[in-house]
Structure formats: structure tokens, C-alpha cells
Amino acid sequence: MRSTKVIHIVGCHAEGEVGDVIVGGVAPPPGETVWEQSRFIANDETLRNFVLNEPRGGVFRHVNLLVPPKDPRAQMGFIIMEPADTPPMSGSNSICVSTVLLDSGIIAMQEPVTHMVLEAPGGIIEVEAECRNGKAERISVRNVPSFADRLDAPLDVTGLGTIMVDTAYGGDSFVIVDAAQIGMKIEPGQARELAEIGVKITKAANEQLGFRHPERDWRHISFCQITEPVTREGDVLTGVNTVAIRPAKLDRSPTGTGCSARMAVLHAKGQMKAGERFIGKSVLGTEFHCRLDKVLELGGKPAISPIISGRAWVTGTSQLMLDPSDPFPHGYRLSDTWPRDE
């Protein structure tokens, strides 16, 4: 088979959300930091288009690129590529990356527990993997510092009127709204409507509320997180949530960065304190087990250090190739499966 490039990929999903991992065939992008490298990937778009667009990818797919770490504390770095964004951090993708690193032997597995330090674009993350019989069975990640930004802010959304929302950062930026406010329930049969309304809310939040990270060059709201009320049993809170990802799809997992942002909001509202746990449930019913580990400051703002825990499974291996006569070297997107990102 002739090809001008060959990219080696290990397929993976974390609690339902695809997070494939490039393990070979791509040189590290330019940049002095992993953050700068991720900005190159985002602005250049060549790799993003090749692996995410049809016919090699699809709107459902996230892909992670392994890179040598820049921080001496880390064993590996990774850059996350989502359908419309190249984010600072992702819970489900970090769980996929950790699982692939251990299950494939790229990093030596130690049973029953392997400790790793990885470098995401958003910063260093500590990983604890519960391992048995050559399989990383559960991954726990200390996420980057997370914080609430705006609480109970009014937001005008076409077709919905004025709704009350929170905004927060949990490794990525979110506008958070209760499902009852928009007349929805979080269930598979409403996935299309949830995704479309969520993207509309995200657009309105960027126009009316905005967001600015105190330390990173991250100046927009990426996602809408739609939630149902939390319940409490002792020191454990449980809540269903789903995240609308541009151009308009739902995260199949409970969204680790979303759970972190939600815990930051719960803490800011006095509804959760350090040491308490949160179980986030996805639209599929899968779970991330989270903990508000400690309270800290980030750039003068109150913040939390969250830990997120979930499972991932390798789904296969593949090689992406490009024949020199292929008319679609950058792929393509059609609005039947790639919703219009307006």
C-alpha cells in the first residue's frame, strides 16, 4: 500500500466517550511548552483535520497526541484534539491516555497501583491507576485547579428567554444550566435537542458573559453543561449532567472537566466542602467518581483541587494513511453529521 504518511493509533473510550491516542507517526509540534505546542496544533489544523474529519474521523471522535513532556516531573505529555477545540485539559481523554500508556506498555505497569505524572496543555496532572492482570482498571486523576467564575448570572437565549446560569472552569470553561430551566431531561432520546440547545447557550454566554482564565490564554466559554439537581447521602453528592460539545454533540461520559467545574460551583455556593465526594452520571448512565480534595487559590481567585476517577477500555488499533492520489487529504465535513457551528 502506498502512502505519504502513516499514523499509528490505539483506539480507546472512557465511560463511553471516544478518546483515541496517537502513539506513532507524528513528530512533536513546535513550542517551548506543551501549551504552546497545543496552540500550534489548534492554529495549524493540519493534523486536526486529518484525524478528526471524515473519511478518517467523525464528529464523535476525540484524538490525543502523545508528546515528550516539557516539565521534568512528567513522564509523558499529551495534546487533546476535539471536534471544534484543542482544550487545556480533558478528564475522559486523560483517562484514555493513561489507560493506553499502561495497557500498551509505553509506560511500565506496576500492580496493584501505578503512579504517573502527565503533562496536559493546561498543566501537570497526577495519575493513580489501579491495575490487575495487565489491565489498568480504574484511573484517578488530580485535575488542574478549578474555580467558579459567575454565579446565578442572567442570560438571554433566543427561544428560551432569560435563564440563570453559572460559569466555571474545570480544566476547560463551562456555562452551567439546570435542565428544568430549559424544559429538558437528560436522557438518550433527547440527545439531539440537548446538544443543539447547549451550543446555543454557549454562544449566548460567550457574547454576554465571557470568560478569562487568570493564568492561561483562555478567553472563551467552550461548553454548556446541562445538569439535574444533586442528591446527598452523607458526604457523597450525586448528580446527572451532560455537556454539549461544539459543533453539537453530547459527551458520552460524565465529563471530568465538567464534574470539576460543577464541584467548584457547588463549593462556591456552600453546598460542598473539602473532602466530600461527587458522583457524576452521564447521559448513558456511566459514572465518574470525584472528590473535592482541597481548597486553594489560583491567580487570586478561590479554587479547588479536584480528583476525578473513571474507567477506560482499549477498542483496537489502526493506521491512518494518505494515498498521494486521495482527493481529500484534509478530509471534509457535511452538515448531516457535522452540525452547523453557528
UniProtKB/Swiss-Prot annotation:
Active site residues of this protein: S90
Classification via InterPro entries: Pro_racemase_fam (IPR008794)
Alphabetical list of SUPFAM superfamilies matching this protein: Diaminopimelate epimerase-like
Binding-site residues, substrate: G91, S92, D251, G256, T257
Keywords: Lyase
UniProt xrefs under NCBIfam families: T3LHypDht
Protein name, per record: Trans-3-hydroxy-L-proline dehydratase
